[in-house]
């Protein structure tokens, strides 16, 4: 993948070139979410793949007069008889006085991503990110694993050869990311990042319409001819940003580093020596006594 430079001047410039029916120019829009964890003076930022945008719709949202603040100090927005709460830290705009242009995206969801059915962006006061459902109801954005930690969303352009195709049209020994079920739309084979399924065998009897797919675990599963698959691998994590760390810590994607010897310095090694250097004793006039 090749990542283009992100421009936050105007959302219309970011969305320029996206075909509502799908990308025909070989350039697709992917969305990434960024989660940050901090322990002491160490700050780690994870950037993950979120989904691929298929189409988008633009509409104007005007907060009603019933909007205000509740007893907990949250922003409340009334829409179609339902009240949705927002944290003050998530939004830098006053939703009671400003018009908000929202962009609702329909996308191909990553199986390991959080179960959202759309993302909307506001063009007033910079690019603000608000998740929406299929009925365009605003909701609060939080991490499913940790309800105390919030994350932001970024829109970037990428060059990718990944696209959706019917499994009946692709050849054998083709890597696919996941096989969605045509009945309920859920993926049958949710793969870890960086891995893929392998289309292995095809049944010669066309009336059966069965194809065997090899999973990364080595097992084979039988799928139907009517399923559509996402070609290519699931994109791995882009990068992990971490500041100055000590030797011996697991910071590189969970791989334990090999530290040879013990450095007598507590900054470079957790088993280090003194907090300050050992200097020779000096007299009040600055001369060494020994």
Curated annotation (Swiss-Prot):
Q: Name one Pfam family in it.
A: Ribosomal_L2_C
Q: Which compartments does it reside in?
A: Hydrogenosome
GO BP, one annotated term: translation
Tell me a Gene Ontology molecular-function term this record carries.
structural constituent of ribosome
> Do the record's keywords include ATP-binding?
no
Q: Which UniProt keywords apply?
A: Hydrogenosome, Ribonucleoprotein, Ribosomal protein
One cellular component term (GO) for this entry is:
ribonucleoprotein complex
InterPro entries named among the record's database cross-references = Ribosomal_uL2_C, Ribosomal_uL2_CS, Ribosomal_uL2_dom3, Translation_prot_SH3-like_sf
Similarity field: Belongs to the universal ribosomal protein uL2 family.
Oligomer status and interactors:
Probably part of the large ribosomal subunit.
* The protein, known as: Large ribosomal subunit protein uL2m
Naturally occurring in which organism (per UniProt): Nyctotherus ovalis
């Amino acid at each position: 993948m090749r990542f283009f430079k992100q421009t936050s001047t105007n959302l219309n410039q970011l969305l320029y070139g996206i075909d509502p029916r799908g990308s025909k120019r070989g350039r697709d829009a992917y969305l990434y979410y960024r989660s940050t964890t901090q322990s002491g003076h160490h700050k780690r930022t994870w950037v993950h793949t979120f989904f691929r945008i298929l189409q988008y719709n633009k509409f104007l949202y005007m907060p009603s007069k019933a909007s205000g603040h509740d007893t907990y100090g949250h922003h409340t927005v009334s829409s179609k008889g339902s009240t949705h709460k927002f944290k003050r830290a998530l939004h830098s705009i006053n939703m009671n006085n400003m018009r908000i242009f929202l962009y609702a995206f329909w996308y191909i969801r990553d199986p390991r991503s959080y179960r959202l059915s759309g993302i909307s962006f506001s063009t007033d006061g910079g690019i603000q990110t608000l998740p929406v459902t299929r009925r365009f109801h605003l909701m609060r954005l939080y991490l499913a694993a940790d309800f105390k930690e919030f994350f932001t969303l970024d829109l970037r352009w990428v060059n990718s050869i990944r696209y959706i195709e019917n499994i009946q049209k692709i050849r054998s020994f083709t890597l696919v990311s996941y096989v969605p079920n045509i009945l309920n739309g859920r993926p049958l084979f949710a793969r870890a990042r960086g891995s893929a399924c392998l289309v292995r065998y095809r049944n010669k009897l066309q009336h059966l319409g069965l194809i065997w797919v090899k999973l990364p675990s080595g097992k084979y599963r039988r799928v139907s001819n009517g399923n559509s698959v996402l070609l290519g691998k699931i994109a791995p994590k882009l990068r992990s940003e971490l500041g100055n760390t000590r030797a011996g810590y697991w910071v590189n994607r969970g791989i334990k580093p090999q530290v040879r010897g013990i450095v007598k310095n507590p900054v470079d090694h957790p088993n280090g020596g003194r907090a300050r250097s050992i200097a020779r004793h000096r007299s009040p006039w600055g001369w060494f006594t020994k």
